[in-house]
Regions:
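Classical Sec-dependent N-terminal signal peptides that target proteins to the secretory pathway
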Residues: 1-24
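Residue-level detector of short, conserved catalytic/binding motifs and their immediate flanks
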Residues: 8, 66, 181
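Amphipathic/hydrophobic helical signal segments and adjacent flexible N-terminal regions
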Residues: 21-67, 71-113, 209-236
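Active-site acidic/histidine clusters and adjacent loop/turn architecture
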Residues: 114-121, 127
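Short helix-loop boundary/capping segments
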Residues: 124-218
């Protein structure tokens, strides 16, 4: 019996080591994939997201928890005024930090569309679907079809592909948008002044628009944008 128990323990131990090695390998592959996407930008093509997993929401490092004021500056068109909005990240039932998708999208939408925005609604059956309602019977149906991210306590690095269908009376238009996000704590001395204050978060978003040819894996981006983002902590 003792020999059998020992063999079982050894078997479970080896399985655990194998799983950890497998997760580390996948994470390494995803990191390489994401770095390649950033390096290819802006001469970027729609690709196969072979490590994609849309069964889980984006998970953020613990230091993202709380509410933040975001300033997003278009680097390509730096003459444009920055877009400023609030976002919130919270600990979900699985004890991981996720974004408040509807609230955050609505906040960004208000900053972009102003009073034209009516509301943003999440699909109760899927974390990947969302509808943005605008005035004059105008609405945008957004579906996340691909998602890659690495798990790293020091950085948030992810890539999502969204199919957006814009509906307005008498017409509809499909567009594919890829957003690569890379954020980390800013280099800052602010904690020396106030130890209770969280570090600002800094980073970039690389956005590529591919048009309406859904399913074609070799489309060149028809439009690219790069944004510099700064998050300033508001409250928990």
């Amino acid at each position: 019996m003792k020999i059998l128990l020992l063999r079982l323990i050894l078997c479970l131990t080896f399985q655990g080591i194998f799983l950890q090695s497998s997760f580390a390998l996948v994470d390494s592959n995803v990191r390489e994939f994401l770095e390649n996407r950033v390096n290819q930008w802006p001469e970027i093509y729609l690709t196969s997201f072979k490590f994609s997993d849309i069964s889980k929401d984006l998970i953020y490092p613990k230091w993202f928890e709380g509410s933040w004021l975001v300033t997003s500056q278009d680097i390509i068109n730096d003459s444009e005024e920055p877009v400023i909005y609030k976002v919130n990240f919270f600990k979900n039932y699985s004890d991981v930090i996720v974004g408040n998708r509807a609230k955050n999208s609505e906040s960004i939408g208000k900053a972009i569309f102003g009073d034209t925005l009516i509301k943003v609604v999440n699909d109760p059956d899927s974390i990947n679907n969302q509808i943005t309602y605008l005035k004059d019977d105008f609405y945008i149906d957004s579906r996340i079809t691909e998602r890659n991210q690495i798990q790293d306590d020091d950085i948030f690095f992810a890539d999502e592909l969204v199919i957006q269908t814009v509906h307005k009376p008498g017409a509809s238009r499909v567009n594919q948008v890829e957003t690569i996000s890379k954020f980390q704590k800013c280099d800052s001395e602010q904690l020396e002044i106030n130890v209770s204050q969280k570090n600002d978060i800094c980073g970039f978003q690389y956005v590529a628009t591919y048009g309406s040819k859904v399913g074609d894996p070799s489309i060149h981006a028809i439009k690219t944008n790069k944004y510099k983002l700064t998050f300033k902590f508001i409250e928990n």
